[in-house]
Regions:
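Short acidic-hydrophobic surface loop/beta-edge motif
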Residues: 11-12, 70-75, 162-163
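Residues at the C-termini of beta-strands that transition into short coil/loop
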Residues: 23, 88-91, 141
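A hydrophobic, helix-centered structural microdomain
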Residues: 28-94, 129
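A short, polar/charged loop-to-alpha-helix boundary motif
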Residues: 92-103
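A short, structured surface patch at a secondary-structure boundary
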Residues: 102-165
């Protein structure tokens, strides 16, 4: 987890022996295509089936003040940036002082935002990122460049994460 690595609370090696390993064997073209087709089909179906819930959540977030959606630059495959889409769960201008990791009791999180985060409803718009090809259903979570740079300083192996498409799970 990002916070654990940055805070030094998670060991990435023990006396020079890695505690985390990445096994990145490239997928065959048919495997990549099958995975992409599954991503498209499942994310399209999820967006369609969840559209009533998405509309209700968007309405509630707008009524709380501000836009329903929050876009943030993240690093994807080959460390290319893309805009991740989420329901807004923080007050407007929450990162005006610069990037910060959030915590459960973070005062920047709105009341409705706490509820959305508790049930992971703020993540549902990411099915759009999957549909457009920025993300996959399964893959490592995409990180912001600011924090990825800090992780790379402590765990150079982290660079291997950019060999695969980031995912919702």
């Amino acid at each position: 987890d990002t916070y654990g690595i940055l805070s030094g609370m998670v060991d990435i090696d023990e006396h020079g022996l890695p505690l985390m390993e990445w096994h990145l064997e490239p997928m065959d073209p048919w495997q990549r295509n099958t995975k992409r087709l599954a991503d498209i089909g499942i994310s399209a179906l999820a967006l369609l089936c969840l559209s009533p819930l998405l509309l209700v959540v968007a309405f509630v977030v707008i009524r709380d003040g501000g836009p329903a959606f929050f876009r943030q630059e993240r690093l994807g495959k080959h460390a290319r940036t893309f805009k991740i889409l989420k329901f807004r769960s923080m007050h407007m201008g929450a990162e005006s002082a610069g990037p910060q990791l959030s915590s459960e009791e973070d005062p920047r999180i709105t009341g409705i935002g706490r509820f959305l985060r508790k049930y992971r409803l703020d993540e549902l718009p990411q099915f759009w990122n999957v549909l457009t090809g920025d993300m996959s259903l399964v893959g490592p979570r995409p990180e912001r460049a600011y924090f990825a740079d800090q992780i790379l300083e402590k765990a150079p192996q982290y660079r291997h994460i950019y060999k695969v498409q980031p995912g919702i799970t």
